[in-house]
Amino acid sequence: MTRTRQLFASLALALAAASGAHADPWKGKGEAGIVFARGNSDSDSVNLKLAMSREIERWKHSLDMSYLRASSNGVESSNRFVGGWQSDYKFSERTFAFGALRYERDKYSGFDYQASASTGLGYKFYDTDKIKLSTQAGLGYRQLKDNVTGQTSGNLVFVAGMDYENKVTATTKIIDKFHAESGSDNTLLTNYLGVEVKMSDKLALAAGYDVRRNTKPPAGKKKTDTVTTLNLVYAF
């Protein structure tokens, strides 16, 4: 695992180093949803997200991270961290190449971790103030560890993704993000569907539905997990 982390760190630094003379500042948003319930039953949940990006001439660098933890009556039921880095190089207003790194640690999925590095091509179908729609596909390498058997495996994967945003009103935006990694040992599918409602230039409320599916989870683990969230969003 140490070598994998070193590889990912080296790739991230190499991708970030590709720069030009004129760079826009980092822009993005942070989200937080925290619930503490006490009474006949005790439950706690924490849902944190960070998404930020920066454009440097033809380059765009993006960082995404999320953390989810939930417990009921002192018994933990969810504990997941997902982090990703992507660098895009624009060939034109619509086409781009990408290099991406992704790391996921989900305590209750049956996999101790799933880590991948990939590259490929993308296309922007819409890129307006109202609608944004882009897709991408490519190949990569993924390493995962079964937390039931303790075995680690790695193989080539096909990766695909879609990002969609639609400003249906001046204050309301619909978001859909899809990600897929398919290899011989497992196919990971994730989809986030959300609605954001602006309260001010910086603050918004976001309601989301997150679906995750592993087609070949370890024995005794379910294939599909879903999470419904309500977060406060701060844009910067």
What does each of the following model-derived ranges do?
Residues I34-R38, I56, Y67-S71, Y103-K107, ...:
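Transmembrane beta-strands of outer-membrane beta-barrel pores
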Residues W26, D42-V46, S77-F81, Y113-A117, ...:
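Residues that define the transmembrane beta-barrel architecture of outer-membrane proteins
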Residues I34-F36, M52-R54, Y89, Y123-F125, ...:
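Residue-level signature of outer-membrane beta-barrel architecture
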